Amino acid sequence: VLTVHRFHRLLALASLLLIASITDVAAEEAVFLSEPKMLQEHGAGEGPVWHPQLGLLTSGEGNINRRDLSGKTSIYREGAGTNGLLFDRRGRLVVCDNVRRQITRIDPDGTATVLTKSYEGQRYNQPNDLTIDSKNRIYFTDPQYGKRSGMEIRDRDGREIEGVYRIDPDGSVVRIIAHEVDRPNGLIVTPDDKYLFVADNNNSLGGARKLWRFALDGDGMPDLASQTLIHDWKTTRGPDGMKLDQQGRLYVAAGLNKPHLPQETADPPTAGIYVFSAAGKLIDFVAIPRDETTNCGFGGEDGKTLFVTAGGSLWSIQTAVPGYQIR
């Protein structure tokens, strides 16, 4: 049966395929096994991360919120002021505290440790999202949205920096990207530590809305000359949070359903999850009927549930392949 929702998804996908000049998607393995299902209307703005005992945590309404294994919701950490969330290999929650402009680690007992709050004496902008590689190095983005008067981080020529940083296990911090990306947002390192994907989401008029890939060396440093454009959202809202599945496919939250003129249009296929093959080819799209799809994360008992945050709401989609989880 061709439902109205299914029709709109197919129409959006047809537009996407035309834009991307993709002609052989039918030959690709299935990506999604269900339509998006709304789980919550409010309280899930960003950073969905799964824990096998706790359930799902999200950033929303100034707190870290919890949706337990039975679906019951509660506040996990009040007044957290966070955006991106990620559990490390020791079960500690590492968060981008964009209100306090720092990266914080929260132990299971609730003890919080600030990992970094400045670089070379300059306070960060708004730490947004993070990823962890196989050597337990933490990479995070530091964009600036809204007013820019409070920005401290600048290069030696006085230019403002919205950069990407890496925290090593010994606590040292290095800036690995400065001006190569306009306004870095979501990011992820591949499981083999060979590549770093960075979402360039500059929502200013004429800003970049692009997905980039950088090759990484053994020390976790990007080869800036390797910078490769994976996809360009042009004038609509660009890429935000992203995750990988166990086949190396990349799921990227992007787009919007209502134009924010003159800065951003609402061109088809609009807001949802864009899926790229391991080779960087756009292979699928599923629409989310809420403005601004912000992030996604895999979870569930079998790892085949993709949780999606969009405009404060929370959605779930069943996938054919489990998501990659830090182990």
Where are these predicted regions, by residue range?
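Short hydrophobic transmembrane-like helices used for membrane targeting/insertion
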Residues: 1-4, 19-25
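Sequence-structural signature of mature extracellular/luminal beta-sheet repeat domains
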Residues: 27-327
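Bacterial N-terminal signal peptides
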Residues: 11-21
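Compositionally biased, intrinsically disordered low-complexity regions
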Residues: 10, 25-26
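Bacterial N-terminal signal peptides that target proteins for export
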Residues: 2-12
